[in-house]
């Protein structure tokens, strides 16, 4: 190619790139090609730990939150049934001294009526704990999140993509 042709190509924005240059960046080397590798995680050796952490976050965390919040209502309902004469024909002396049948029925009703607000509270507790513990887990493999440029405020969400 002549010198004039090179100058014309550089002026047009060619910048030395040829038609055979790859348009997309090259993929990672084979040892990094696993979908399980994330920054800070070494991939396949930590797969059982990652699965266990996901199990704890998604199964045991809600169970613990709901149990902790709903336990008082369950105890009140249990005490109401324990001291009612139709459930136990001969309630213990403590129950007879503390509650009549009307008092036991009131405990049962109070415990059952307190369940819906406590369910909402338990759901909020579970959501907040899950949100706080989410950074401890790596993102799911194969689902990249939106990228935001560092240092930009969240006023206008701008999605960045490689072009």
Swiss-Prot record:
Record localization: Membrane
Region described as Disordered: 1-37, 136-156
Annotated TM spans: 51-71, 105-125
InterPro entries named in the record: TMEM88
Keywords: Membrane, Transmembrane, Transmembrane helix
Domain of life: Eukaryota
An individual GO BP term: negative regulation of canonical Wnt signaling pathway
Residue ranges with Pro residues bias: 136-148
Family according to the record: Belongs to the TMEM88 family.
Listed name of the protein: Transmembrane protein 278
Organism: Homo sapiens
């Amino acid at each position: 190619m002549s010198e004039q042709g090179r100058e014309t190509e550089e002026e047009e924005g060619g910048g030395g790139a040829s038609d055979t240059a790859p348009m997309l960046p090259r993929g990672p080397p084979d040892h990094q090609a696993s979908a399980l590798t994330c920054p800070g995680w070494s991939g396949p050796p930590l797969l059982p730990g990652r699965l266990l952490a996901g199990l704890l976050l998604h199964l045991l965390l809600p169970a613990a939150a709901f149990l902790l919040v709903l336990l008082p209502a369950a105890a009140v309902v249990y005490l109401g049934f324990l001291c009612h004469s139709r459930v136990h024909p001969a309630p213990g002396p403590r129950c007879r001294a503390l509650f009549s049948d009307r008092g036991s029925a009131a405990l049962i009703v109070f415990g059952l009526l307190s369940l819906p607000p406590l369910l909402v509270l338990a759901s909020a507790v579970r959501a907040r704990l899950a949100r706080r513990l989410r950074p401890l887990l790596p993102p799911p493999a194969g689902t990249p999140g939106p990228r935001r440029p560092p240092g930009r405020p969240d006023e206008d969400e701008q999605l960045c993509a490689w072009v």
